[in-house]
Amino acid sequence: MKKKVISAILCGAMVLGTVCPVLAADDKSEDTKTEAAAGDSAKGKKIALVGKAAGNAFFEIAAKSFQETVEAEGGEVQVVYPETATADAQIKVLDNLISQDFDAICISANDVNALQAKLEEAMDEGIKVSSFDSAPNKDSREIFVNQAGTKEVAQALMDAVLDISGGEGQFAILSATSQSANQNAWIDAMKTI
């Protein structure tokens, strides 16, 4: 129970870090930015949260906290999952969201580069684009919020391998998909430990 509470608090903080700066970027006034970041920047906004795929426990906790936080500030959230954990499926989701006049899209990307054209289209339409967990490239978003440092995750994973194996034998590293940016970064970092 304690872990769930801590996870929810961390997810809520991550949500605020993802949503508030992006929506506050509408107004260039420093005072307005500060006020928006303080809590009411989601008021009246329609925000989409796009996951990698349905059924991911981490994302479901994050989505719940995201929705609670935005709705508490007067915004509306639509949580959307692609049919499959692929960039092509996320592109279909993004097409649909762009046509629905969302104010902001926050995405956990299935591919670093494949979403660029569609996310740039969204930004050209005035939609604020942010990401968390797994980032598209820098040209495809306005902000990325990382839930944990790459090296720290890699170290924790390697510590778990050591604990389980007792320091002997071989182990395999599996990723959800070959294009999963965050997981591939963790794997690369694990190889250096």
Task: Give the ranges of each region predicted by the language model.
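A residue-level marker of the well-folded mature domains of exported/periplasmic proteins
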Residues: 2-5, 9-10, 14, 21-193
